A protein has these predicted regions:
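Core Rossmann-like FAD-binding/catalytic domain of the broad FAD-dependent monooxygenase superfamily
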Residues: 1-293
Length: 293
């Protein structure tokens, strides 16, 4: 199942706005975080004014440039890939010209790999952009067409809905918890999108943390239970999400022959196939987190 983040957020928004004890505020920026023995206070800037909010805990799920993470003084080590990624969205129906094309298709090429993601009404095609290729060149119409012409021989002059160019990072916060404040999602970890592990990993963070908060809130578990969140989620992020997403990129940069042979060997062995599917589906990472206690 493919569900774009833009669609998921709208679904969540509709659900949350109907909750009587839930308040959604937009255009509000966290400026400071102060922790007390029994709670957290944040200063937010909204409509030109500074306001304060208090609570027992704080979850910073405010993206890769997290103001909460910065206010807490938590480092965000890692690296930025030298390549940028270009996404070209087109209504062209690749399934009509590529037999047996699936919803997500990866094409390895040491010169310039690409992958196709089919969503309702559009197909998104991603390419790496080399360091020597400027941003201006990358988003130009002619350059996008030249890349798209390599996808299917003989097909050119695609209708392009839009192009998006962005930098790609691999970073994991030094800790996912500081006192009564927690980090989740992109605020805690970011990775290249190959394999679809970013948003899924963030959802795993949310379920892991909030289930513990509910238990502590209702008094069925002590507050020490919350420390397991950082212990579990940060380690599996390093061991699985970061490691696998980096390997996915390296696989695409290969000539495809060795990787194809490796996949064929895995497919021929039921036990290895099972282990491989557990890993790439992220089920293995959930089991690993549970085993950490």
């Amino acid at each position: 199942m493919q569900c774009e983040q833009s669609k998921l957020t709208r679904i969540l928004y509709q659900q949350l706005r109907e909750k009587p004890d839930f308040e959604l505020q937009f255009d509000a920026q966290v400026k400071d975080v102060t922790q007390h023995r029994s709670g957290v206070e944040i200063a937010i800037e909204r409509n030109g004014r500074t306001e304060t909010r208090t609570g027992r805990w704080l979850i910073g799920a405010d993206g890769a440039r997290s103001d909460v993470r910065r206010a807490l003084g938590i480092e965000f080590p890692g690296f930025t890939w030298p390549e940028r990624f270009l996404v070209v969205s087109t209504p062209f129906d690749f399934r009509a010209v590529i037999p047996d094309l699936v919803a997500v298709s990866y094409v390895s090429d040491p010169e310039r790999w690409h992958f196709l993601l089919q969503i309702p009404s559009l197909c998104r095609v991603m390419f790496p952009i080399a360091p020597h290729e400027s941003d201006e060149l990358a988003v130009s119409a002619d350059f996008a067409q030249s890349l798209m012409a390599t996808v299917v021989p003989g097909v050119s002059n695609y209708e392009v809905a839009h192009v998006t160019l962005y930098k790609v990072h691999q970073r994991v916060a030094k800790t996912f918890q500081r006192g009564r404040a927690f980090l989740a999602g992109d605020a805690a970890h970011i990775n290249n999108p190959l394999g679809g592990m970013g948003m899924n990993g963030g959802i795993h963070d949310a379920i892991n943390l909030t289930s513990r908060l509910v238990e502590v809130w209702h008094g069925t578990k002590a507050e020490a239970e919350l420390e397991r969140y950082d212990r579990q989620r940060r380690l599996v992020t390093l061991e699985y999400i970061e490691k696998q997403s980096i390997q996915n990129k390296r696989n695409l940069e290969s000539n495809g022959t060795d990787f194809g042979r490796s996949l064929a060997e895995i497919a021929a062995d039921k036990s290895r196939t099972y282990e491989y599917l557990l890993r790439v589906s992220m089920i293995a990472s959930l089991r690993r987190a549970q085993a950490l206690g």
